[in-house]
Amino acid sequence: MPVISVCSPKGGVGKTTVVANLAYAFSRSGSKVVVVDFDPQNALRLYFGLSLNDERGIVTLPNKDWISSCISVDKNLYMLPFGKSDKEQRAVFDEALKQDNYFKNVQSSLFDNPDVLVIADFAPGYTQALDSIASVSNLQVVPLLADAASVSLFSQLLSGGLMDGLVGGGLGYYIVLNQIDNRIKLNREVQNFALQNFKDNLLGMIHKDTNVTEAAGQQISVYDYNKNSAAAFDIEVIAKKVAQILGFDVKKGTKVINPLRRQNV
């Protein structure tokens, strides 16, 4: 199955929320999903009901097979938190990730697994993890807001460069405009610009929706909180488009066809 990297040059765009609910969308459809948190903030676990006191994570397991450490959080859904860490542990972790073909060699049982869809969450901007995973990442999802700060990044994306050129690996990058509000003129203008300029690289838009915030506060998916919400519908549409782009079908609980991965092996 494919590896999807969710990354953004800008923080505060709702990236981790997108990761969590996208994972829920795929698992609800029958796909076996593993979510991996590469962000030292270690916040993704909170979207899946893990305790603040739970210190488990991949940061202390750089040379061990992560698939045996996956935590079951829902039907068809597993996660690997980043874990509690200090500066020295993060330095050792980054050094391990620098190994040639780290994800193909050390972590191949997870990242080259035909029965698992991997969705990886990253800290904003360039990171060693984002650099290292480029060799196995099939698609990069880049959440941005429909605001002035994000507009300043559009020209870099359109020219093919951002985050040290990492955007563009595999099948390339796809933009998600998050928290859109059509009552705001700038929001509407940014949407129109994105539609005209990114075209097929605009994966979709997610409406600003209090249901998302409330669901996160209760550590559940937006589908469990309100499956009829605008954001739930938007994320479902995006998930289906991702599956179409990557060329896989969801069938009764597992899997699928990923010709791109086979070509890369």
PLM feature spans:
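P-loop NTP-binding core
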Residues: 1-265
